[in-house]
Amino acid sequence: MVHVNPIVKSFEYGQHTVTLETGVIARQADAAVLASMGDTTVLVTVVGKKFEEPGRDFFPLTVNYQEKTYAAGKIPGGFFKREGRPSESETLIARLIDRPIRPLFPNGFKNEVQVIITVVSVDPEINPDVISMIGTSAALAISGLPFNGPLGVARVGYTDGEYVLNPNVSQLVDSDLDLIVAGTQGAVLMVESEAAALPEEVMLGGVVYGHDQQQVVISAINELKAEASKPAWDWTAPVQDADLVAKIKDLAEAEMAAAYQIEVKQDRYTQVGVVKSAAKEALLAENPEADLREIDGLLGSLEKQVVRSRIIAGNPRIDGREPDMVRGLNVMAGVLPRTHGSALFTRGETQALVTCTLGTERDAQKVDSIMGEYTNRFMLHYNFPPYSVGETGFVGSPKRREIGHGKLAWRGINAVMPSAEEFPYSVRVVSEITESNGSSSMASVCGTSLALMDAGVPIKTSVAGIAMGLVKEGDDFVVLSDILGDEDHLGDMDFKVAGTRDGITALQMDIKIEGINKEIMQIALQQAYGARVHILNVMDQAIGEHRDDISDHAPRITTLKINPEKIRDVIGKGGATIRALTEETGTTIELEDDGTVKIASANGDATKEAIRRIEEITAEVEVGTIYNGKVVRIVDFGAFVTILPGKDGLVHISQIAEERVANVSDYLQVGQEVKVKVMEVDRQGRVRLSMKEAAPKAEAAPAE
């Protein structure tokens, strides 16, 4: 019998108990942790390659997050009945885990590391994202890899003016905030949130609250590490060649500084490439055996130093702006003739062409996940083609980054979207990034707000987004508004804020260094507010409120109510009636259990015809009313006449004419149209009709 020795740590976290266990499962991995929060359990494994591949100039960290349907007691759909490619939710959670752990690996570490998180049990009330992040932090902490953790994680809600630690799924429905914050003992590293237009101070308070509360997570992981950690890897950061650093500085510093005063991105990149090539040629001429990878790395470090030192010294930014300035804006709405709504939003060298398409409830996205089934009426898709940065590349299914940016923009807009009762349409927005030089996701937020208004979607108010950056050297720091791509790459923080004039709807923060304190975040939020209001003012000049009507090319949804008992009549046997209705009128018809009927069509006449026919089908037969009917069957004792769709009545032979009728066929033929009067509807729903009573009465003869 194999002897196993589990090491377990448990602690209370909000209203849930968190358990971390190692030593039983997946013992051949460098580290494996079974992490549980309530009944939601994930298995996290970490494996790192012991040797670095020659020639590699990046850190190959891979995070794979996978939700197994057996965790929820389900069998996968589809022909093969097994899990397939990652869903959007799995991709987003993988990114959520990756972002805070990546900066905790030391510079120069380039060994391949793979983290696999497998959801093996799920409580529909407890989302696996936070416990997956906690489990990943614990597994990395005990793996022996050079990881500067552990990392703490907390979800924060905000209900009735109070912060809530680790709210469950039901509690989040009534919460004005859904915020996840991750950080080390002394610093916040990542924030991801969605909010109902909350003030800056409430958002900042949520970040601080979450960071304070997650210290219990860090303590528990440290205890686990003390008992279960593998031996630390014998890895040391590569030592820089001081002579080579000095030579590169002499060769390229002045030229690099000059290149970074070129404001046009493509021209600047070309000149930076020229400077680097010249430096490499000079160094290789001096020493043909020089390590090109090392030279490239040192040139990159010099590039970073040149840009950062200028900003810290108070010099103008790369494109000549002051720290709090927003690039020039160009905003247009209604730029495409046949789309339901469109906008072109340009900020400096970043541009988004955004379209809005309206559809019926049938067009909504139906999602079946391990957390349950739900429907998305509002979809936002972000595309980043290679031409947007002047490159060639693969065009196909969306990458992780595109999915993540689309979701961030969705969070920024979702708080102002109308309810289904206010606007019974499904809405799909697509943001095509046509130019990119920093903060394309926030350009998507601005463009989406404009396109929705152009489409006539009654959003509550305009929404704008802005990306903030940071350069910090020692105690000196500069917060930058509307960062360029270079400032994002070479800076210490990417801080994206979307919101209205009243508050923040989405906040995403990724920090690459330790030491970001409350003061810096406060300054960034205040600066972001000023930039956001400036952008909103420009947007409102293009279109300040939603159009009064939707596009002529959009389907118009007309709603009517019928008796719920009549739904089966509208559907017909095997769906024949509703199928004929939709095909013959060219409309889309949706029925709800409460008797609500939604008819969608871009053609008003088609809608009217569909309404008329549905009203006919669902109309009640009224005693005493005269109908234009059609003979459908003749029998010896009379004729059956259709007076409404699906409703026949009997004209008895005695009710066909005033005179005595011997043979019904002498008076009536199948298909003949006749006027009939409803005489009676019995308890069984049988209708008695009369042609005699429907005929005009002869005028009384005058008295003699």
Curated annotation (Swiss-Prot):
The keyword Cell membrane does not apply. It catalyses: RNA(n+1) + phosphate = RNA(n) + a ribonucleoside 5'-diphosphate. Its EC number is 2.7.7.8. InterPro entries: ExoRNase_PH_dom1 (IPR001247), ExoRNase_PH_dom2 (IPR015847), ExoRNase_PH_dom2_sf (IPR036345), KH_dom (IPR004087), KH_dom_type_1 (IPR004088), KH_dom_type_1_sf (IPR036612), NA-bd_OB-fold (IPR012340), PNPase (IPR012162). It is found in: Cytoplasm. It comes from Shewanella sediminis (strain HAW-EB3). The lineage of its organism: Bacteria, Pseudomonadati, Pseudomonadota, Gammaproteobacteria, Alteromonadales. The gene is pnp. Signal peptide: none annotated. Residues 624-692 form the S1 motif domain. Keywords: Cytoplasm, Magnesium, Metal-binding, Nucleotidyltransferase, RNA-binding, Transferase. GO terms for molecular function: 3'-5'-RNA exonuclease activity; magnesium ion binding; polyribonucleotide nucleotidyltransferase activity; RNA binding. Involved in mRNA degradation. Catalyzes the phosphorolysis of single-stranded polyribonucleotides processively in the 3'- to 5'-direction. HAMAP family: PNPase. It holds the Pfam family RNase_PH_C. Its main location: cytoplasm. Its cofactor is Mg(2+). Belongs to the polyribonucleotide nucleotidyltransferase family. Component of the RNA degradosome, which is a multiprotein complex involved in RNA processing and mRNA degradation. Residues 555-614 form the KH domain. It comes from the Bacteria. This is Polyribonucleotide nucleotidyltransferase. The keyword Cytoplasm applies. One of its GO terms (cellular component) is cytosol.
